[in-house]
Amino acid sequence: MEIKEYTRDCIPDVVQFERDLRAEEDFWGWEIDEAYIAGVTASFTNPAFDNSLSLLAYQDGKVVGRIDSTKICSRFDGSTKAYLDWICVIKSYRHAGVAQALMEALRRKLREQGIDTLIGLIAANEEAQRFYRSLPNAQLRDEGIWIDTNF
């Protein structure tokens, strides 16, 4: 397995990953259409995404896993933390160390940038919760909330 940083050149591989995800589990909440691809492509030239860090796990010549994070700077305590936005592995590649390798690589890259805390919302499904409980030096605490700003 090879872990690589997600760059613009990887977009076709990631689009195929998204399609492979849907072939094995059809419950994802967004469509892989031209608008989606255009938005992802634009994110690589939009400075608003400069604090984003995404890694891809390649195996058998294709993307089988992905992890996405964003740096969060806070004047609350003058710290920089990171938010874990998403981690996902194609179902047929789960329980083979892919998610662990992605998480380890992300933690290493964040440490290199002086970030010592990664914060994430916990998915409601039990499989994801088992994964988070298995992470070394991690603890489940607090609760997350999604607040819609369109009111």
Model-predicted segments: where are they?
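Conserved beta-strand in the GNAT
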Residues: 56, 62-71, 83, 88
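Conserved acetyl-CoA-binding loop-helix of GNAT-fold acetyltransferases
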Residues: 89, 95-108, 134
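Conserved acetyl-CoA-binding loop of GNAT-fold acetyltransferases
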Residues: 132-143
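A short beta-loop-alpha structural element at the N-terminal edge
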Residues: 1-16, 27
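A short helix-loop-beta-strand connector motif used in the catalytic cores of GNAT acetyltransferases and
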Residues: 42-56, 83
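Conserved GNAT-fold acetyl-CoA-binding loop/helix
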Residues: 22-42
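A conserved beta-turn-beta hairpin within the catalytic core of GNAT-like acetyltransferases
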Residues: 72-84, 94, 140-142
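Conserved beta-strand-loop-alpha-helix junction that forms the acyl-donor binding cleft
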Residues: 119-129, 146-151
